[in-house]
Amino acid sequence: MTLLAAHAVVTVLALASVAWATNSSQGAKRWAHELVVLDDVDSFLGAASSLAYRAQLELGAPLRLSVGPQEPDPHADWWWRERVAGRFDRAPTSDELSSWYVSPPLRSAGGFEQLLLSWNIDCPPESGACFELRVRESDEHDWTPWLYVGDWGSAVPAATAVEPEDGSHLVTSDGPKLVAVDGARVDIDFFTSERTWSAAQFRVRATASGDQLNRSVIVRRVALCFSRRTDEPAPSFVPPAEAIRRLDVPFRSQKTERSGIAGRICSPTSVAMALGYRGLEVDTLAAAERIFDSAHDIYGNWTRAIQGAYSFGAPGYLARFSDWNEVARHIAEGTPLVISIAAKEGELDGAPYAKTAGHLLVLCGFDEKGDVRVNDPAASTPQAGQLVYRRDQLERVWMARGGTSYVILAPRKH
């Protein structure tokens, strides 16, 4: 996985590692991934090419979106209106409820066919935010309309919002959410297309209900992971000594939870294991309730898992892996990965299931042969669930199917 740092000049993103990462899957093209993380003032500003309304940049935030009624703060509003947006002709009124931010264009070095978006945000009571994406094929092409990715909080913004020519506000509508356009779509929690795109933007819209003054939705981190198919060869891999270990991730079983949902909560169970490893004891059912996606009636929404983990105290992001060396680096640094797999019958020896259309488990380390140590929540006991899977088989059921992972980090120090 290539890490791209989002600097102040976002139109030319700097490579933080030297090559595309690839995975091997006999007879098929391999995946290559790039990761862009915005988590500081410079990356959100993007050489003044971002747009915002009722928003402020702060070193500790780094992005603060005012929601609900506000006491007048003309200096902060002026800074965004004049320096960043440069085209607003009026100041916000004190009784407006909503705010928004549009990122600079974020370019993929090799183009992309799929894209994961994830976020860490703080929402006060009676507030919420939604995230949207739009993409374009090249600088000569127009952007697509905004596609709805997901939301968080108790007050959800309107389903759609269109920016008028003067740019001073958004015209919103509560009609159906737009999730597909021009041969591309948001498939529950990720963007996918048969076409290749060159750049993306995200938009976050925040709002609130009630009359409490001076509330803000704080955006701490936004991550985008671009993915494309490639013919490039897979890197060789020998597990380094520091990755030959089993991280002390406390095992949990989804099977011991409430019978009505036990078969559906592999994602929150795996998140709870990762949180426990980070020193945050969260009940599995509490994690499931927090992460549950009522719009799709699933517990396995990837974006909600990342934000849910953050709401319990652990920041993180969605990433994709296609290079075992990158996986080993995370293990060596003490970071387990919650990974998303799909396996046909006979594809994963020793698993506590014959096949799965979709399942999540925790990757905890490597053994001396380079095979992979995991905590699989589909087992009922630690003895049955702390397993070693063959690396070639896990590559087939994980990396060749996208390599999606939750990267859950240590709690943020205040």
Question: How should these model regions be labeled?
Answer:
Residues 126-133:
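Beta-strand acidic-aromatic groove motif in beta-rich domains, primarily in extracellular
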Residues 31-35, 45-58, 62-89, 107-110, ...:
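Noncatalytic regulatory segments and standalone regulatory/sensor domains
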